[in-house]
Amino acid sequence: MSQPPQSPDAPGTTDVDGGVDSLADEVTSDVERAEAQAGDEDNHQQQAEPSDQRSDEHDEDYRAPVVVAPLPGASAEPPRSSAPAPQAQPAETPRPRHTALSLAAMASVAVAGLNPTRLALPQSETPERHIIGVIDTQGRHWEIHEARTDAVGASLEAEAEVLRRIGRVVDDGRLSFDVPRVAGSLRQKDAHIQVRSHVEGKPIPVETLRPGPGMSAGLGKALGEIHELSMTVISEAGMPVYDAEEVRRRWLSLLDDTAATGRTPPALLGRWEQALEDTALWRFRPTVVHGDLAEENVLVAGGTVVAVRGWSQAHVGDPAEDLAWVYSSAPVDCLDSIEDAYDIARSEGVDRHLRERAELVSELSLARWLLHGVRTGDKPVINDAVAMLEDLAAQVGDAPLVEPATPRLAPVPG
């Protein structure tokens, strides 16, 4: 999960010691080194690849290679709304850390005309990813994303393909919100960066939304527009595509794995199994799914949704996966406003079991969190997940998630 920006509506900036000229001067020497290394990499690549290899950057017919990992729901954060996570893979050794100045230098090589002058928000760092903001000499605000593992690098590249395609939809005026635009990337032996435009706005305060035509309706509209996107946005970007039955079977597999841990209340296992075996619940038309909706990925300004980011887990699947976050986070009195705006944005209407599946996804995300703890041997995560599962079991008791249909009998002739 990316960290929420710590800035207000206007982008914050941080001058390094010496101010603008200092950063520009220091970046210059790093740029020369980055250009030299990039040149070496290009020469090596030209020797290794056929000279007639086509470039995909500007080819409209280019179809990105299918990305096997990460699948939707592979996040190592507390679960929100994504599909089941795959088995944990052995951890990679992160690449060496690069300073903000080095990243700025590489960005100036990756994007022609990008001459950074000062640092800006966001500034976040994890063992797998480093993100910095910079302002260039033209006043443009950029984000530099450094991937420190191959898995994160693959995720960045896959997300870039999705962003390029959604960006075209935005430019055609068919979306009411913006997305980050990928301006360039640079891959070297010990570094992999991607440069994106910075999208303005603050994380949506979903827990304090109010009913009515403001942000609640704006959130519903944005979700509906996401689910109306052409599925080719995902399939041509090489991201996963699941039909309704595949979605159901993936959740069933997660249920089996959860039961095998012996840490889940039996009443919950029965509740989930009943819902997953109810075939009527799983008759839906797959849509584009964002896959990682959270406050920090939905940005607002002026009382409306202005941008959506964090598309690395996008896929085609069950729209209930996105709505699970809404139903578990938004105030109850806002749900009608969100749903009404969502319904209006959907051209073919909404299937009648969408809300029930969203509730199921929300509950199963706790099971996914438990499995993450078990697979990584993280006892605090296991204990946290077990506690949440026990709380949920106490809340729902023996009630089924979906009430079985009661057959209607004809009146007995009197």
Task: Identify the residue ranges that each predicted region occupies.
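Juxta-kinase regulatory segment immediately upstream of eukaryotic protein kinase catalytic domains
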Residues: 2-5, 70-73, 77-118
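Intrinsically disordered, low-complexity, charge-rich segments with an acidic bias
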Residues: 3, 21, 25-61
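ATP/Mg2+ or Mg2+-diphosphate-binding catalytic cores
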Residues: 3-5, 70, 368-414
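An alpha-helical support segment within catalytic cores of ATP-dependent transferases
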Residues: 99-114, 231-290
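ATP-binding pocket architecture of kinase catalytic cores
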Residues: 120-234
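Active-site acidic catalytic loop and adjacent metal/ATP-binding pocket
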Residues: 126-136, 143-144, 276-321
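A glycine-centered beta->alpha junction motif in the catalytic cores
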Residues: 188, 193-209, 228, 252-260, ...
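Active-site activation/catalytic loop segments of kinase-like enzymes and analogous catalytic loops
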Residues: 320-350, 360-378
